[in-house]
Amino acid sequence: MIQLNFPDGELSQSEEFASRLTTEILHLQPNLLVAHAPNDYHADHRAVSAGALIAASFRAPVLWVDPMMGNDFLPNYYVDITPFQDQKEQAILCHTSQGPEHFVEMSRVQGHFRSAQCGQLEGFAEAFRHDPIHPFADIRSLIPPAPPLQPMVVKSPTRNASPKPI
């Protein structure tokens, strides 16, 4: 893990921040950059989002993370995290200063919801969004698969051949 040592709660969309992110991306040369969504609830997260987009430029595609409770977020990629949900919850609980129990419950609700969007009523999924920007139009080979889709069939009521009187 790399820490840039910017103050918590005071991060801004500054040129200095974007420059430091760019330096790290040039050094690490990632295949994919996963960052907070531009509409995330937390100001620091929005600053990371803006900085990541500038820093990634033509170096790596950016995959936006579903913000808490998915407000105004239209995902186009889903990843089955069912085998890792317990680990995710343990990681969230490590953030003791943030009142983590609330965030664990929110993670469960959101994970079930995103899994259900894939037709899986059991399990957990995380949702992401990639906005294709040249030269990174297709990133499917860079991410794990979504939960398997379960087809749903809805039967319409049978229509009566003879018209009903009015």
Spans of model-derived segments:
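The feature marks non-catalytic terminal segments
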Residues: R59, P67-I166
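Active-site beta-strand->loop->alpha-helix modules in alpha/beta enzyme cores, enriched
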Residues: M1-F58, M69, G123, P145, ...
